[in-house]
Design a protein with these regions (language model features):
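Structural marker of alpha-solenoid helical repeat scaffolds
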Residues: 312, 346, 380-381, 414
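A glycosyltransferase accessory/donor-loop signature
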Residues: 76-90, 97-103, 115, 121-123, ...
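Register position in tetratricopeptide repeats
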Residues: 329, 363-364, 397-398, 427-431
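Active-site anion-handling motifs in enzyme catalytic cores
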Residues: 426-838
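GT-A fold catalytic core of metal-dependent nucleotide-sugar glycosyltransferases
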Residues: 145-192
Length: 838
């Protein structure tokens, strides 16, 4: 079934109003509405001063390990994304309980080595030095003065609090506790035989899993027994198993997760006491036990327990490489190089380490050294393909296209199935073939364009975006009018000469302000340009619709980025960022004199109907809803809530499928993990639209021909919105909430951490489908402000470029209208790849 867009009846409610009319208000800390409001507030504040960071998270300073570099910060935007903050809370009444606290911390690390959340130690006023030993056992320990254990109900800054006691030790995995989302979970108090009995209420010395949004914050419980019965969630006794039950030397049941020694005489002996004694270790023995554990380990814990290496020791080379990979993942490439440089000195027989060292040196822009170590890594047949792929990338970064092609070919000779080498071979072969083709236009008549130019199976959004940027300046978006400079290529003297030969240099759009995608030591963000080269750009320089793309909780070092940012703003004649959230964040990093140069320039994909006459007419729509999810940096996106997210999405899809066919829009192959997980875990199969295989026109046609897009990627919302299609954002990154705040539609977003995600998403989606003309009209109305801001900025930019207005004059182009329905037989079928069932 297909439909045409049509004009809604006067007085029709917008989808935002319709969708939210019956949605009950939730705790403000976790709702997307509050998140977007926070984005709006920061945007408004940034008009006259830099927006301030929210109050420091409880872990920010007090819990940082002494070895942490002061320049490293975790970007905390939980108020925007709704990401859950989890903490353990332990009340220590006196110094006599400190050994119990230490045993608890050791047991937690040894049984859950991949888990590291804040541990808030509540105490009545013990001296700071009392916690020195505990600090050595956990990198995120936060002592906090409290009047009693009940203060665990009052821990501001956290959504979920797991209250433990010094009388407990952890014997198993606690993932189930982390996944709890409602009420206060506890094991009922024990009866005379020690077995939990619901009639005995909740003991004050047992485990509690507290969801703080369910509590009355004005009057939280004064003790466990005061928890309202309606909030209680019973836990199986294995999560708080009483050692008193193990009389006559009974063994501890194998499934016990938390063993509680409350009221157990210290003179007792037996298997339970032996289980606890296993965690009475000195620091050296404990560190050795943790490092010897198999499987995944949390990066914070591994760094905390492994470093510094004991003086005179020779740490295992695999451990050194693991630590270097952690530093690399956090952008601390200098620390990784320092570790690996010592380890591989005089050791050409360590290919994996040489590969990692080469990649880290490349991230520091120490390209000659990087090439040497990567070549050493190619000596191993096992690592040669990966090393050759990195060498191809390195040579490409330096403009050595023939060398890059040769390295990629060598990698394919080592392993003909290596996808990375095959992609580099295809890219560089095309570049070599096109190298002799010169545009008809002289350089002085061209614009230089610095951006990410996706190829092959890369992100579909990064394919559409550069063309949209160019459409703002010229009707011809091809190589005759534009000189393409990939942002990741090093701008050397020859590159600088090419840029300066152009009429102007346009940088953007996209999330270029991101430290860990193609890191380099020259700028600290995605444009690989040294400060001294940037200072010698003489062509007019415009930063256009760029985004501050740092993830919630992402750690990075700001100094190099901030210095490059200041140089960029100083040099730019125009500096426009794609949302007010980015404007506020970037202004925070600038001196006062430069802040007002930062202005708002929406992403041009959001105004596609005004840029492309082909999109200005009526849209003919199928009865489909498209969903998109993203999986890069999944830990930062989902935290502990991925299973919850998947289950809630399954419920929403079942509900929405009653009104429309639900299909999946993959912007890149990795996005298809969602349909695989959905089928495996919940038995649902979705047809897949592989957007990464489509042309830009086909991508826009697909998004224009559906009735609703539910997207997690930024451009899975902005591209359909720009084509006039209603959207709902799955908020896992601040940029989605920032965009919704800009268009004053915060309720078009639902956090991936939302407890009632499935119900909220289904309700909002069905409201859009029920009154689709009103939803489309609301999208068109929201676009007007974005187009007005874009037109005003383009007027300024025409003064820089000297180019004519591609839209026919200084006045605003007329808004596209929503026409009356037309027969389905008249519609122009979009060209697209047929959906694939997964």
């Amino acid at each position: 079934m297909t439909t045409n867009d049509s004009t809604p009846a006067a007085g029709s409610a917008s989808p935002s109003a319709a969708a939210s009319a019956s949605v009950p208000a939730a705790d403000s800390a976790s709702t997307p509405a509050a998140a977007s409001a926070a984005g709006s507030a920061s945007a408004a504040a940034s008009a006259s001063r830099p927006a301030a960071d929210p109050a420091p998270a409880p872990a920010s300073a007090a819990s940082a390990p002494a070895s942490a570099a002061a320049s490293v910060s975790a970007d905390d935007r939980r108020a925007v994304t709704g990401k859950r903050r989890i903490a353990f809370a332990v009340y220590v009444a006196d110094v006599g309980r400190l050994p119990g606290l230490q045993a608890l911390l050791r047991s937690l690390a040894l049984t859950n080595p991949a888990l590291c959340e804040d541990v808030v130690v509540l105490h009545p006023g013990l001296p700071d030095t009392a916690f020195d030993a505990a600090h050595r056992l956990h990198p995120r320990l936060i002592p906090r003065t409290a009047s009693g254990r009940h203060d665990a109900f009052r821990l501001d800054g956290y959504d979920t609090v797991i209250a433990l006691t010094p009388a407990q030790v952890v014997l198993g995995g606690i993932d189930t506790l982390l996944r709890l989302r409602t009420g206060v979970a506890a094991v009922p108090g024990p009866g005379p035989d020690g077995v939990p009995d619901p009639r005995n209420g909740i003991p004050d010395d047992g485990i509690l899993v507290i969801q703080r949004q369910d509590l009355d914050h004005r009057e939280p419980p004064a003790a466990a027994r005061d928890i309202p019965e309606s909030l209680l969630v019973p836990l199986d006794s294995r999560y708080d198993f009483r050692a008193l039950r193990l009389r006559d030397d009974l063994a501890v049941p194998e499934d016990v997760v938390v063993l509680n020694f409350a009221d157990t005489p210290t003179s007792c002996t037996g298997p339970a006491q032996a289980a606890r004694a296993r965690h009475d270790l000195d620091d050296e023995a404990f560190r050795a036990a943790y490092l010897a554990l198999p499987g995944a380990k949390h990066p914070d814990l591994l760094l905390h327990f492994a470093l510094p290496f004991p003086e005179g020791s020779r740490p295992p080379i695999d451990l050194v490489r693991q630590l270097a990979e952690i530093h690399r993942g956090r952008g601390h490439h200098d620390l990784a190089v320092a570790l690996l440089g010592k380890a591989v000195a005089g050791r050409p027989d360590l290919p994996r380490c040489h590969e990692t060292l080469g990649v880290c040196l490349m991230a520091l822009s120490r390209y000659e050294e990087a090439e040497t170590h990567l070549l050493l890594a190619t000596a191993s047949l096992d690592f040669a393909p990966r090393a050759f792929g990195q060498l191809a990338r390195l040579a490409w970064l330096l403009g050595r296209t023939e060398d890059a092609r040769g390295y990629a070919l060598a990698g394919l000779e080592s392993d003909p199935t290596d996808a990375n080498c095959r992609a580099w071979y295809a890219r560089t072969s095309e570049m070599v073939a096109a190298g002799g083709t010169a545009p008809d236009t002289s350089p002085g008549e061209q614009l230089a364009h610095v951006a990410l130019f996706a190829e092959g199976d890369e992100n579909a959004g990064d394919k559409v975006l550069p063309e949209a940027v160019r459409s703002c300046f010229t009707a011809d978006t091809g190589p005759d009018r534009w000189h393409q400079q990939h942002a990741h290529l090093l701008v050397d003297e020859a590159g600088l000469e090419r840029l300066n030969a152009r009429r102007a240099v346009i940088v953007g759009g996209g999330g270029l302000f991101l430290p860990d995608t193609a890191p380099n030591g020259n700028s600290g963000w995605q444009w690989n340009i040294p400060d001294d080269v940037l200072a010698r750009i003489t062509a007019p320089l415009a930063v256009f619709a760029v985004g501050y793309n740092v993830f919630d909780g992402q750690r990075y070092r700001r100094e190099r980025f901030a210095a490059s940012l200041r140089a960029l703003v100083e040099r730019s004649a125009f500096f426009g960022l794609r949302n007010h959230g980015s404007v506020a964040r970037v202004r925070e990093l600038l001196p006062a004199a430069l802040r007002e140069k930062v202005r708002y320039q929406p992403c041009p994909t959001t105004v596609a109907r005004h840029l492309d006459p082909r999109l200005a007419g009526p849209a003919v729509r199928e009865d489909t809803v498209l969903i998109n999810c993203a999986y890069d940096r999944a830990g930062l996106r989902f935290g502990h809530d991925y299973g919850h997210f998947l289950a809630e999405m399954a419920a929403a899809i079942r509900a929405v499928s009653a009104a429309a066919e639900v299909r999946y829009a993959a912007h890149m192959p990795a996005d298809e993990r969602f349909v695989d997980d959905l089928r495996r875990e919940h038995g649902l199969t979705l047809p897949v639209e592989p957007l990464y295989l489509l042309s830009n026109d086909a991508i826009r046609d697909l998004y224009r021909s559906t009735r609703l897009v539910i997207g997690m990627r930024g451009h899975a919302g902005m591209i359909p919105f720009g084509c006039g299609t209603p959207v709902i954002s799955l908020v896992s990154h601040p940029k989605l909430a920032y965009f919704l705040a800009d268009i004053d539609r915060p309720d078009w977003g639902v956090s991936v951490h939302e407890r009632a995600l499935g119900a909220r998403l289904a309700e909002r989606a069905l409201a859009v489908l029920a009154d689709h003309p009103a939803a489309v009209a609301d999208v068109h109305d929201r676009q007007r402000a974005l187009w007005s801001a874009t037109r005003d900025n383009l007027t300024l930019l025409r003064e820089l470029t000297g180019l004519p207005d591609p839209f026919g004059g200084p006045g605003r182009a007329p808004d596209p209208v929503v026409p009356a329905p037309r027969p389905a037989s008249d519609r122009d079928r979009p060209s697209r790849h047929p959906g694939r069932a997964r």
